[in-house]
Amino acid sequence: MRIVLVDDERTFAGLSPGDVILRNSDSALLFFSKLHIEQQMRYGDELFAIYLDHDLGGDDDIRIVVDFLVLCPILTSHVFVHRQNPTTDWIVQTLFKAGYNAERVALPELA
């Protein structure tokens, strides 16, 4: 299983070469839109564990990515939302209602 990390600052320890780090909402939207199309064309592709950070630097945040994930579902085993931001509950509830296995988590060990 590959991991997709959407975070403007952090990199987790133990990431594999196939894992993906996205630093802002624009790169996350591009990545997830391509993945959504690929999954729609070839059902059953590799599942991803997705880690989301709310604050992506400056005025950028994860909300537009969450909206996209609700409208264009991604086949994934888990979505983990870093629990250091007050909007975490909204993100988890929104994704859970859309069918994702979403939960609040502490930050994994950083690299």
Sequence positions of predicted segments:
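Catalytic phosphate/metal-binding cores of nucleic-acid and nucleotide-processing enzymes, i.e., regions
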Residues: M1-A111
